[in-house]
C-alpha cells in the first residue's frame, strides 16, 4: 500500500531524494530503472556514505565516518592529538549542498535539452574530500 502511494506521487514529481544504504530502493522494487518507467522525467538524487558504486558502496555511512575517511578531520585540531569532531555535522551539510546542486543541474539539463530524468549520486566521503583542495598538495 505504501509503495503504491509513493509510486503514484512519483508519477508526477520532478525529483526524489533518498538517503538509504545503496540497494534499498532496489530491494523495495523501486530501482531507478523501475521509477523511470513510471516517470521518465524523474530526477533521482541518491545520498549515501560512500556512493552507489565502488568497493565501499554497500557499507552504511554517516557524517562522522565520511568526514574522517574523506580527510577533512585531518585539518581540524592540533598536531599530535586525535582530530576532534567539528562543532556541526559538516559532512551532512556539504553533501546536502552538493546533492541540491546536482538536482538543480539535472533539472536544468532536463528542461533545456532532453526532457529526461537523471540519477545524481552524492556521497558524504566524496563531498568531504572535495573540500581538501590545497591541503592535498601540502
Feature locations, PLM:
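N-terminal Rossmann-like NAD(P) cofactor-binding subdomain of oxidoreductases
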Residues: 18-74
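Short, small-residue-biased leader/transition segments that mark boundaries at the very start
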Residues: 1-2
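An anion/phosphate-binding loop that grips the pyrophosphate of nucleotide cofactors and donors
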Residues: 13
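Acidic, glycine-rich segments within the central catalytic cores of soluble metabolic enzymes
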Residues: 69-138
Amino acid at each position: 500500500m505504501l509503495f503504491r502511494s509513493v509510486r503514484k506521487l512519483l508519477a508526477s514529481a520532478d525529483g526524489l531524494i533518498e538517503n538509504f544504504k545503496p540497494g534499498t530502493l532496489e530491494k523495495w522494487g523501486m530501482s531507478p530503472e523501475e521509477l523511470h518507467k513510471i516517470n521518465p522525467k524523474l530526477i533521482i538524487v541518491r545520498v549515501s556514505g560512500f556512493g552507489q558504486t565502488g568497493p565501499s558502496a554497500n557499507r552504511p555511512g554517516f557524517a562522522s565516518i565520511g568526514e574522517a575517511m574523506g580527510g577533512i578531520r585531518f585539518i581540524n585540531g592540533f598536531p599530535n592529538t586525535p582530530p576532534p569532531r567539528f562543532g556541526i555535522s559538516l559532512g551532512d551539510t556539504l553533501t546536502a549542498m552538493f546533492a541540491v546542486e546536482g538536482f538543480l543541474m539535472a533539472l536544468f539539463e532536463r528542461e533545456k535539452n532532453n526532457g529526461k530524468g537523471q540519477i545524481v549520486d552524492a556521497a558524504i566521503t566524496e563531498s568531504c574530500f572535495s573540500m581538501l583542495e590545497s591541503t592535498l598538495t601540502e
